Amino acid sequence: MKSELIFLPAPAIGHLVGMVEMAKLFISRHENLSVTVLIAKFYMDTGVDNYNKSLLTNPTPRLTIVNLPETDPQNYMLKPRHAIFPSVIETQKTHVRDIISGMTQSESTRVVGLLADLLFINIMDIANEFNVPTYVYSPAGAGHLGLAFHLQTLNDKKQDVTEFRNSDTELLVPSFANPVPAEVLPSMYVDKEGGYDYLFSLFRRCRESKAIIINTFEELEPYAINSLRMDSMIPPIYPVGPILNLNGDGQNSDEAAVILGWLDDQPPSSVVFLCFGSYGSFQENQVKEIAMGLERSGHRFLWSLRPSIPKGETKLQLKYSNLKEILPVGFLDRTSCVGKVIGWAPQVAVLAHKAVGGFVSHCGWNSILESVWYDMSVATWPMYGEQQLNAFEMVKELGLAVEIEVDYRNEYNKTGFIVRADEIETKIKKLMMDEKNSEIRKKVKEMKEKSRVAMSENGSSYTSLAKLFEKIM
Protein backbone atom coordinates (compact mmCIF):
# COMPACT_ATOMS: atom_id res chain seq x y z
CA MET A 1 0.00 0.00 0.00
CA LYS A 2 1.29 3.44 -0.92
CA SER A 3 1.86 6.09 1.74
CA GLU A 4 0.54 9.64 1.54
CA LEU A 5 1.50 12.80 3.41
CA ILE A 6 -0.72 15.88 3.45
CA PHE A 7 1.06 19.25 3.55
CA LEU A 8 -0.69 22.43 4.66
CA PRO A 9 1.50 25.54 4.15
CA ALA A 10 0.61 29.04 5.29
CA PRO A 11 -0.51 31.19 2.33
CA ALA A 12 2.54 33.43 2.06
CA ILE A 13 5.12 32.87 -0.65
CA GLY A 14 8.05 32.31 1.73
CA HIS A 15 6.13 29.64 3.63
CA LEU A 16 4.58 28.00 0.56
CA VAL A 17 7.76 27.62 -1.48
CA GLY A 18 9.65 26.01 1.39
CA MET A 19 6.97 23.38 1.97
CA VAL A 20 6.52 22.55 -1.72
CA GLU A 21 10.27 22.15 -2.15
CA MET A 22 10.27 19.96 0.97
CA ALA A 23 7.51 17.85 -0.57
CA LYS A 24 9.64 17.37 -3.69
CA LEU A 25 12.59 16.36 -1.51
CA PHE A 26 10.48 13.83 0.41
CA ILE A 27 9.24 12.29 -2.84
CA SER A 28 12.74 12.08 -4.31
CA ARG A 29 14.01 10.30 -1.22
CA HIS A 30 11.16 7.78 -0.76
CA GLU A 31 9.80 5.91 -3.78
CA ASN A 32 6.65 4.69 -1.99
CA LEU A 33 5.58 8.15 -0.83
CA SER A 34 3.19 10.65 -2.39
CA VAL A 35 2.42 14.15 -1.12
CA THR A 36 -0.74 16.24 -1.45
CA VAL A 37 -0.25 19.98 -0.84
CA LEU A 38 -3.33 21.99 0.15
CA ILE A 39 -2.92 25.61 -0.93
CA ALA A 40 -4.98 28.42 0.57
CA LYS A 41 -4.96 31.67 -1.39
CA PHE A 42 -4.01 34.93 0.32
CA TYR A 43 -5.32 38.12 -1.22
CA MET A 44 -2.22 40.23 -0.44
CA ASP A 45 0.44 37.94 -1.88
CA THR A 46 0.36 37.80 -5.68
CA GLY A 47 3.45 35.60 -5.55
CA VAL A 48 1.31 32.70 -4.31
CA ASP A 49 -0.82 32.80 -7.48
CA ASN A 50 2.17 32.95 -9.81
CA TYR A 51 4.03 30.19 -8.03
CA ASN A 52 0.89 28.06 -7.95
CA LYS A 53 0.49 28.42 -11.73
CA SER A 54 4.10 27.34 -12.25
CA LEU A 55 3.45 24.19 -10.19
CA LEU A 56 0.42 23.28 -12.27
CA THR A 57 2.28 24.00 -15.53
CA ASN A 58 5.26 21.83 -14.54
CA PRO A 59 3.79 18.94 -12.52
CA THR A 60 5.95 16.68 -10.36
CA PRO A 61 5.14 12.94 -10.28
CA ARG A 62 3.52 11.87 -6.98
CA LEU A 63 2.99 15.51 -5.97
CA THR A 64 -0.65 16.64 -6.04
CA ILE A 65 -1.58 20.31 -5.70
CA VAL A 66 -5.07 21.01 -4.33
CA ASN A 67 -6.24 24.61 -4.33
CA LEU A 68 -8.63 25.32 -1.49
CA PRO A 69 -11.63 27.53 -2.36
CA GLU A 70 -10.87 31.23 -2.49
CA THR A 71 -12.57 33.47 0.04
CA ASP A 72 -13.61 37.09 -0.23
CA PRO A 73 -10.72 39.45 0.72
CA GLN A 74 -13.27 41.60 2.52
CA ASN A 75 -13.36 38.87 5.18
CA TYR A 76 -9.81 39.83 6.20
CA MET A 77 -9.14 43.41 5.17
CA LEU A 78 -10.54 45.04 8.30
CA LYS A 79 -8.85 42.61 10.68
CA PRO A 80 -5.58 43.45 12.48
CA ARG A 81 -2.55 41.87 10.85
CA HIS A 82 -2.09 39.21 13.53
CA ALA A 83 -5.68 38.00 13.08
CA ILE A 84 -5.52 37.39 9.32
CA PHE A 85 -3.94 33.92 9.19
CA PRO A 86 -6.18 32.53 11.97
CA SER A 87 -9.16 33.75 9.96
CA VAL A 88 -7.81 32.13 6.79
CA ILE A 89 -7.53 28.70 8.39
CA GLU A 90 -10.93 28.99 10.07
CA THR A 91 -12.59 29.57 6.70
CA GLN A 92 -10.84 26.49 5.28
CA LYS A 93 -11.40 23.97 8.08
CA THR A 94 -14.49 22.41 6.52
CA HIS A 95 -12.70 21.92 3.19
CA VAL A 96 -9.62 20.44 4.87
CA ARG A 97 -11.80 18.06 6.88
CA ASP A 98 -13.56 16.85 3.73
CA ILE A 99 -10.23 16.27 1.96
CA ILE A 100 -8.69 14.33 4.86
CA SER A 101 -11.88 12.31 5.27
CA GLY A 102 -11.86 11.30 1.62
CA MET A 103 -8.17 10.41 1.61
CA THR A 104 -8.36 8.28 4.77
CA GLN A 105 -11.14 6.20 3.19
CA SER A 106 -8.97 5.16 0.25
CA GLU A 107 -8.21 1.43 0.04
CA SER A 108 -5.04 1.92 -2.00
CA THR A 109 -3.33 4.66 0.03
CA ARG A 110 -2.49 5.06 3.71
CA VAL A 111 -2.36 8.63 5.04
CA VAL A 112 0.72 8.57 7.26
CA GLY A 113 0.62 12.16 8.49
CA LEU A 114 -0.32 15.79 8.17
CA LEU A 115 2.58 18.25 7.98
CA ALA A 116 1.24 21.69 8.90
CA ASP A 117 2.96 25.06 8.89
CA LEU A 118 3.40 26.17 12.48
CA LEU A 119 0.91 29.00 11.87
CA PHE A 120 -1.71 26.38 10.95
CA ILE A 121 -1.02 23.94 13.79
CA ASN A 122 -4.61 24.16 15.05
CA ILE A 123 -5.62 22.02 12.08
CA MET A 124 -4.31 19.23 14.33
CA ASP A 125 -7.84 18.98 15.76
CA ILE A 126 -9.14 17.79 12.40
CA ALA A 127 -6.23 15.38 11.87
CA ASN A 128 -6.94 13.89 15.30
CA GLU A 129 -10.54 13.16 14.25
CA PHE A 130 -9.14 10.73 11.67
CA ASN A 131 -6.21 9.43 13.78
CA VAL A 132 -3.74 11.11 11.43
CA PRO A 133 -0.48 12.13 13.20
CA THR A 134 0.43 15.82 12.97
CA TYR A 135 3.94 17.05 12.25
CA VAL A 136 4.97 20.71 12.31
CA TYR A 137 7.02 22.64 9.77
CA SER A 138 8.97 25.61 11.12
CA PRO A 139 9.88 27.93 8.21
CA ALA A 140 12.22 29.99 10.43
CA GLY A 141 15.46 28.87 12.04
CA ALA A 142 16.13 26.82 15.16
CA GLY A 143 17.24 29.90 17.10
CA HIS A 144 13.90 31.59 16.54
CA LEU A 145 11.97 28.43 17.41
CA GLY A 146 13.86 28.13 20.69
CA LEU A 147 13.18 31.78 21.54
CA ALA A 148 9.46 31.36 20.85
CA PHE A 149 9.24 28.32 23.11
CA HIS A 150 11.16 30.24 25.80
CA LEU A 151 8.83 33.25 25.67
CA GLN A 152 5.80 30.96 25.68
CA THR A 153 7.14 29.29 28.83
CA LEU A 154 7.63 32.69 30.50
CA ASN A 155 4.11 33.63 29.48
CA ASP A 156 2.75 30.40 31.00
CA LYS A 157 4.49 31.37 34.25
CA LYS A 158 2.48 34.62 34.23
CA GLN A 159 5.40 36.82 33.23
CA ASP A 160 4.27 39.73 31.05
CA VAL A 161 6.66 39.39 28.11
CA THR A 162 5.26 42.57 26.51
CA GLU A 163 7.27 44.46 29.14
CA PHE A 164 10.39 43.58 27.15
CA ARG A 165 9.32 45.90 24.35
CA ASN A 166 11.41 49.09 24.23
CA SER A 167 13.47 47.91 27.21
CA ASP A 168 17.24 47.54 27.61
CA THR A 169 16.86 44.01 28.95
CA GLU A 170 19.04 41.18 27.72
CA LEU A 171 17.48 37.72 27.85
CA LEU A 172 19.23 34.44 28.49
CA VAL A 173 17.60 32.20 25.89
CA PRO A 174 18.49 28.49 25.75
CA SER A 175 18.81 28.50 21.94
CA PHE A 176 21.35 31.35 21.88
CA ALA A 177 24.91 31.29 23.19
CA ASN A 178 24.86 35.09 23.59
CA PRO A 179 22.37 37.15 25.62
CA VAL A 180 19.55 38.31 23.34
CA PRO A 181 18.76 42.05 23.54
CA ALA A 182 15.07 42.83 23.92
CA GLU A 183 15.36 45.23 20.97
CA VAL A 184 15.65 42.29 18.54
CA LEU A 185 12.71 40.29 19.89
CA PRO A 186 10.06 39.73 17.20
CA SER A 187 7.44 42.45 17.55
CA MET A 188 4.56 39.99 17.40
CA TYR A 189 5.69 38.40 20.67
CA VAL A 190 6.00 41.59 22.72
CA ASP A 191 3.32 43.89 21.33
CA LYS A 192 0.13 43.99 23.39
CA GLU A 193 -1.92 44.48 20.24
CA GLY A 194 0.10 42.04 18.17
CA GLY A 195 -1.72 38.84 19.02
CA TYR A 196 1.08 37.43 21.19
CA ASP A 197 -1.40 35.38 23.22
CA TYR A 198 -2.62 33.65 20.07
CA LEU A 199 0.94 32.97 18.88
CA PHE A 200 1.91 31.45 22.21
CA SER A 201 -1.16 29.20 21.97
CA LEU A 202 0.28 27.90 18.69
CA PHE A 203 3.56 26.99 20.37
CA ARG A 204 1.66 25.19 23.14
CA ARG A 205 -0.12 23.14 20.47
CA CYS A 206 3.19 22.60 18.70
CA ARG A 207 4.40 20.71 21.77
CA GLU A 208 1.61 18.17 21.12
CA SER A 209 2.86 17.30 17.63
CA LYS A 210 4.79 14.15 16.74
CA ALA A 211 7.87 16.06 15.52
CA ILE A 212 9.09 19.44 14.29
CA ILE A 213 10.79 19.73 10.91
CA ILE A 214 13.03 22.79 10.53
CA ASN A 215 14.52 24.30 7.39
CA THR A 216 18.03 24.58 8.77
CA PHE A 217 21.09 22.36 9.16
CA GLU A 218 23.26 21.19 12.04
CA GLU A 219 26.40 23.01 10.95
CA LEU A 220 24.65 26.39 10.70
CA GLU A 221 22.83 26.35 14.06
CA PRO A 222 24.49 23.67 16.21
CA TYR A 223 23.93 25.47 19.52
CA ALA A 224 20.23 26.14 18.89
CA ILE A 225 19.49 22.66 17.56
CA ASN A 226 21.19 21.01 20.51
CA SER A 227 19.26 23.17 23.00
CA LEU A 228 15.94 22.13 21.42
CA ARG A 229 16.91 18.47 21.58
CA MET A 230 17.86 18.80 25.24
CA ASP A 231 14.39 20.08 26.18
CA SER A 232 12.17 17.12 27.05
CA MET A 233 9.04 19.28 26.65
CA ILE A 234 9.72 19.85 22.94
CA PRO A 235 8.93 17.14 20.33
CA PRO A 236 11.78 15.54 18.37
CA ILE A 237 13.57 18.00 16.08
CA TYR A 238 14.54 17.19 12.50
CA PRO A 239 16.71 19.77 10.68
CA VAL A 240 16.46 18.87 6.98
CA GLY A 241 17.69 22.01 5.20
CA PRO A 242 18.71 24.06 3.47
CA ILE A 243 15.59 23.46 1.38
CA LEU A 244 15.58 26.02 -1.42
CA ASN A 245 13.73 26.71 -4.63
CA LEU A 246 16.69 27.10 -6.95
CA ASN A 247 14.51 27.45 -10.05
CA GLY A 248 12.76 30.69 -9.05
CA ASP A 249 9.10 31.26 -8.26
CA GLY A 250 7.64 31.38 -11.76
CA GLN A 251 7.26 35.16 -11.86
CA ASN A 252 8.11 37.69 -14.58
CA SER A 253 10.50 35.71 -16.78
CA ASP A 254 10.85 38.61 -19.24
CA GLU A 255 11.88 41.02 -16.49
CA ALA A 256 14.27 38.42 -15.09
CA ALA A 257 15.99 38.14 -18.48
CA VAL A 258 16.55 41.91 -18.60
CA ILE A 259 17.96 41.98 -15.06
CA LEU A 260 20.27 39.01 -15.61
CA GLY A 261 21.36 40.46 -18.93
CA TRP A 262 22.44 43.63 -17.14
CA LEU A 263 24.38 41.57 -14.61
CA ASP A 264 26.11 39.71 -17.45
CA ASP A 265 27.74 43.02 -18.42
CA GLN A 266 29.18 43.69 -14.94
CA PRO A 267 32.61 42.57 -13.65
CA PRO A 268 32.76 39.55 -11.29
CA SER A 269 31.80 40.21 -7.64
CA SER A 270 31.36 43.93 -8.32
CA VAL A 271 27.62 44.42 -7.68
CA VAL A 272 25.90 44.90 -4.33
CA PHE A 273 22.33 43.57 -4.44
CA LEU A 274 19.68 45.20 -2.23
CA CYS A 275 16.42 43.32 -1.71
CA PHE A 276 14.03 43.53 1.25
CA GLY A 277 11.46 40.80 0.67
CA SER A 278 7.87 40.76 -0.55
CA TYR A 279 6.68 43.19 2.13
CA GLY A 280 9.83 45.31 2.38
CA SER A 281 9.17 48.95 1.57
CA PHE A 282 10.44 52.29 2.91
CA GLN A 283 9.20 55.82 3.44
CA GLU A 284 10.46 58.36 0.90
CA ASN A 285 13.02 59.95 3.24
CA GLN A 286 14.64 56.56 3.89
CA VAL A 287 14.70 55.74 0.18
CA LYS A 288 16.65 58.94 -0.46
CA GLU A 289 19.21 58.09 2.25
CA ILE A 290 19.75 54.63 0.73
CA ALA A 291 20.24 56.19 -2.70
CA MET A 292 22.81 58.68 -1.40
CA GLY A 293 24.65 55.97 0.52
CA LEU A 294 24.80 53.76 -2.56
CA GLU A 295 26.04 56.56 -4.78
CA ARG A 296 28.74 57.62 -2.31
CA SER A 297 29.95 54.04 -1.82
CA GLY A 298 31.13 53.98 -5.43
CA HIS A 299 30.01 50.38 -5.90
CA ARG A 300 27.88 49.00 -8.67
CA PHE A 301 24.41 48.10 -7.44
CA LEU A 302 21.16 46.31 -8.24
CA TRP A 303 18.38 47.66 -6.02
CA SER A 304 14.96 46.04 -5.68
CA LEU A 305 12.82 49.00 -4.62
CA ARG A 306 9.16 48.26 -4.00
CA PRO A 307 6.32 50.54 -2.85
CA SER A 308 4.10 49.84 0.12
CA ILE A 309 0.50 48.80 -0.45
CA PRO A 310 -1.53 51.95 -1.23
CA LYS A 311 -4.41 52.71 1.09
CA GLY A 312 -7.52 50.92 -0.07
CA GLU A 313 -5.57 48.39 -2.18
CA THR A 314 -5.26 44.70 -1.33
CA LYS A 315 -2.33 43.44 -3.40
CA LEU A 316 1.42 43.91 -3.13
CA GLN A 317 2.90 46.35 -5.63
CA LEU A 318 5.83 45.04 -7.68
CA LYS A 319 7.35 48.39 -8.62
CA TYR A 320 6.98 52.19 -8.65
CA SER A 321 5.27 53.73 -11.67
CA ASN A 322 7.75 56.64 -11.61
CA LEU A 323 11.07 56.19 -9.80
CA LYS A 324 12.04 59.84 -10.24
CA GLU A 325 9.27 60.85 -7.85
CA ILE A 326 10.89 59.04 -4.91
CA LEU A 327 14.64 59.06 -5.68
CA PRO A 328 16.96 62.08 -5.27
CA VAL A 329 16.99 64.50 -8.21
CA GLY A 330 19.43 63.30 -10.87
CA PHE A 331 20.22 60.00 -9.09
CA LEU A 332 19.16 57.76 -11.97
CA ASP A 333 21.16 59.79 -14.49
CA ARG A 334 24.30 59.96 -12.34
CA THR A 335 24.30 56.22 -11.62
CA SER A 336 23.06 54.95 -14.98
CA CYS A 337 26.43 53.38 -15.84
CA VAL A 338 26.91 51.57 -12.53
CA GLY A 339 23.48 50.87 -11.08
CA LYS A 340 20.03 49.53 -11.85
CA VAL A 341 16.86 50.16 -9.82
CA ILE A 342 14.18 47.51 -10.32
CA GLY A 343 10.92 46.40 -8.72
CA TRP A 344 10.49 42.67 -8.32
CA ALA A 345 13.76 40.71 -8.39
CA PRO A 346 14.54 37.08 -9.32
CA GLN A 347 16.46 36.78 -6.06
CA VAL A 348 17.85 33.26 -6.38
CA ALA A 349 19.13 33.88 -9.91
CA VAL A 350 20.70 37.17 -8.83
CA LEU A 351 22.47 35.64 -5.82
CA ALA A 352 23.78 32.86 -8.06
CA HIS A 353 25.21 35.33 -10.59
CA LYS A 354 28.99 35.76 -10.69
CA ALA A 355 28.71 39.56 -10.90
CA VAL A 356 27.09 39.86 -7.44
CA GLY A 357 29.50 40.31 -4.54
CA GLY A 358 27.29 41.34 -1.62
CA PHE A 359 23.68 41.24 -0.45
CA VAL A 360 21.86 43.88 1.63
CA SER A 361 19.00 41.78 2.98
CA HIS A 362 15.92 41.98 5.17
CA CYS A 363 17.11 38.69 6.69
CA GLY A 364 14.09 36.56 5.99
CA TRP A 365 15.11 33.00 6.79
CA ASN A 366 14.83 31.79 3.18
CA SER A 367 17.07 34.67 2.08
CA ILE A 368 19.64 33.75 4.72
CA LEU A 369 19.73 30.15 3.52
CA GLU A 370 20.02 31.27 -0.10
CA SER A 371 22.89 33.61 0.74
CA VAL A 372 24.75 30.78 2.50
CA TRP A 373 24.13 28.36 -0.36
CA TYR A 374 25.56 30.82 -2.88
CA ASP A 375 28.48 32.00 -0.75
CA MET A 376 27.08 35.53 -0.51
CA SER A 377 28.14 37.95 2.22
CA VAL A 378 25.17 39.74 3.80
CA ALA A 379 24.60 43.17 5.32
CA THR A 380 21.59 43.03 7.64
CA TRP A 381 18.61 45.36 7.36
CA PRO A 382 15.64 43.57 8.99
CA MET A 383 12.13 44.85 8.40
CA TYR A 384 9.41 42.81 10.14
CA GLY A 385 8.49 39.47 11.68
CA GLU A 386 11.41 37.57 13.19
CA GLN A 387 13.97 39.27 10.94
CA GLN A 388 15.56 41.37 13.70
CA LEU A 389 16.33 38.15 15.57
CA ASN A 390 17.68 36.55 12.39
CA ALA A 391 19.93 39.58 11.85
CA PHE A 392 21.23 39.34 15.43
CA GLU A 393 21.91 35.63 14.94
CA MET A 394 23.78 36.21 11.67
CA VAL A 395 25.91 39.06 13.05
CA LYS A 396 26.53 38.21 16.71
CA GLU A 397 25.86 34.50 17.05
CA LEU A 398 27.27 33.13 13.79
CA GLY A 399 29.60 35.88 12.53
CA LEU A 400 28.25 35.53 8.98
CA ALA A 401 27.05 39.08 8.28
CA VAL A 402 27.85 42.80 8.43
CA GLU A 403 25.47 44.86 10.53
CA ILE A 404 23.76 47.85 8.97
CA GLU A 405 20.96 47.48 11.49
CA VAL A 406 19.69 44.58 13.58
CA ASP A 407 16.72 46.32 15.22
CA TYR A 408 15.20 48.41 12.40
CA ARG A 409 11.42 47.84 12.29
CA ASN A 410 9.40 48.77 9.27
CA GLU A 411 6.17 47.40 10.76
CA TYR A 412 6.20 49.59 13.88
CA ASN A 413 8.55 52.37 12.80
CA LYS A 414 6.35 55.03 14.37
CA THR A 415 9.30 57.06 15.65
CA GLY A 416 10.47 57.85 12.11
CA PHE A 417 13.94 56.37 12.73
CA ILE A 418 16.16 56.83 9.68
CA VAL A 419 19.39 55.04 8.76
CA ARG A 420 21.63 57.79 7.40
CA ALA A 421 23.50 57.75 4.11
CA ASP A 422 26.96 57.88 5.69
CA GLU A 423 26.29 54.72 7.70
CA ILE A 424 24.90 52.95 4.64
CA GLU A 425 27.97 54.00 2.63
CA THR A 426 30.38 52.71 5.30
CA LYS A 427 28.63 49.36 5.71
CA ILE A 428 28.37 48.73 1.97
CA LYS A 429 32.11 49.37 1.63
CA LYS A 430 32.73 46.89 4.46
CA LEU A 431 30.38 44.35 2.87
CA MET A 432 32.15 44.57 -0.49
CA MET A 433 35.64 44.35 1.01
CA ASP A 434 38.09 42.06 -0.78
CA GLU A 435 37.91 38.45 0.40
CA LYS A 436 41.52 38.42 1.62
CA ASN A 437 40.71 41.16 4.12
CA SER A 438 37.29 39.92 5.22
CA GLU A 439 36.91 37.34 7.98
CA ILE A 440 33.17 37.24 7.31
CA ARG A 441 33.68 36.27 3.66
CA LYS A 442 35.93 33.40 4.74
CA LYS A 443 33.29 32.13 7.17
CA VAL A 444 30.53 32.40 4.58
CA LYS A 445 32.59 30.42 2.07
CA GLU A 446 33.14 27.67 4.65
CA MET A 447 29.42 27.59 5.50
CA LYS A 448 28.53 27.27 1.82
CA GLU A 449 30.54 24.05 1.64
CA LYS A 450 28.95 22.77 4.84
CA SER A 451 25.45 23.49 3.52
CA ARG A 452 26.06 21.35 0.46
CA VAL A 453 27.63 18.53 2.43
CA ALA A 454 24.60 18.57 4.77
CA MET A 455 22.26 17.80 1.85
CA SER A 456 24.49 15.19 0.23
CA GLU A 457 24.39 11.47 0.98
CA ASN A 458 25.25 10.77 4.64
CA GLY A 459 25.30 14.51 5.39
CA SER A 460 23.60 15.79 8.54
CA SER A 461 20.31 16.82 6.89
CA TYR A 462 20.27 13.76 4.64
CA THR A 463 20.59 11.55 7.71
CA SER A 464 18.03 13.57 9.67
CA LEU A 465 15.46 13.08 6.91
CA ALA A 466 16.12 9.34 6.86
CA LYS A 467 15.40 9.22 10.60
CA LEU A 468 12.21 11.24 10.06
CA PHE A 469 11.03 8.72 7.46
CA GLU A 470 11.58 5.93 9.99
CA LYS A 471 9.29 7.79 12.40
CA ILE A 472 6.60 8.64 9.84
CA MET A 473 6.45 5.39 7.88
Swiss-Prot record:
MF annotations from Gene Ontology: UDP-glucosyltransferase activity
Pathway this chain belongs to: Secondary metabolite biosynthesis; terpenoid biosynthesis
Disulfide bonds: none
Protein keywords: Isoprene biosynthesis, Transferase
Pfam families with a match to the protein in the record: UDPGT (PF00201)
Role: Component of the triterpene saponins (e.g. PPD-type ginsenosides or panaxosides) biosynthetic pathways. Glycosyltransferase that catalyzes the biosynthesis of compound K from protopanaxadiol (PPD).
Protein name in UniProt: UDP-glycosyltransferase 71A27
Native source organism of the sequence: Panax ginseng
